[in-house]
Amino acid sequence: MPLGISKIERLEVYCNQEKVGVLALTHENLCAFQYDAAFLQNGFSISPFHLPLERKVFVAKPNPFSGNFGVFNDSLPDGWGSLLLDRYLKKNGIEVDKLNKLQRLAIIGSSGRGALEYVPDWSITEKATTHDLNILAKDAEKILLTKYHGNGLDILFKNGASSGGARPKVFLKIKNEEWLIKFKSSADPPNIGKTEYYYSILAQQCGIKMPLTCLFEKRYFGVQRFDRNATKRIHTISAAGLLNADYRIPSLDYEMLLRACFLLTKNMEEVLQLYRIMVFNVAIGNKDDHAKNFSFQFENGQWKLSPAYDLLPSSGFNGNHTTTINGKGTPDEEDLLIVAKKIGIAERTACSIKKEIYALCRK
């Protein structure tokens, strides 16, 4: 990435070396996207509800992603990753406020989550390098609490600038496997890593599909990346990106999310898996269940629910679930069954899932 950011008129979008289409900006500073002709013949809709596979120019709405499409906004960092990116760019003399959406996507380039990549590619990444997690954790804390811009900033940027969420994190390759490793934020309790690891194991016991998780150095929670496999990257879109839903505020109800899951996957087993996640979130008090904490993946010609992530107790908005249950931010167990009935899950099945999960979570 050049230190003097150049002007970009258009940005090419790729998925596993195949050109998907082209992004540009309108005079109103809205993103415009058009699929590539070859991709129209052989590809798939990267965002079925908002970018169907059609030969036309799509123009993004001003909200909720400031004139970007949700699927491309997913590539951009938020929270910790955004702080890292802005701090790193300022350190290198780049005026962050003057960057447009295309330039920010070019900075992410090939380093983003999921399968989408952007050309020109200005990304700077560092792969297959081992770092001392304790040192990285201390540097992350300095970045959060001070204006620190030492060598640790460069290392964390190269290994985590595309990440989302509030907590500091890095992508590292360990024994030829790619991991996302989290550190504690200034607001977290000291044992946050152990807590998240415990709930990741509990979620698996509750029948929820999770990526492989690990507690590094007995304190840092790690999750194996599920947007990659040995041969390719896997196209991944968050519920926020899929539904054009604002993840920063309450904007979804689980009924809407479950219906979208069925419309997208056409598979009731995927709906039941998402229902399990809803019940688990209510049972453990995970109220930070915003629209970016659910994702879908396209692989082998099929859409599916991604493995679950970010499952641990949290306070949410004023003690309410960010994604409501039967329209309520503070639901009771009966609301879980009402949602099941609304979306066509048999009462016997819903009761069985609820009973199983609550029994495990109350141990």
Predicted feature residues:
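Phosphate/dinucleotide-binding and metal-coordinating scaffold of catalytic cores
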Residues: 1-291, 295-363
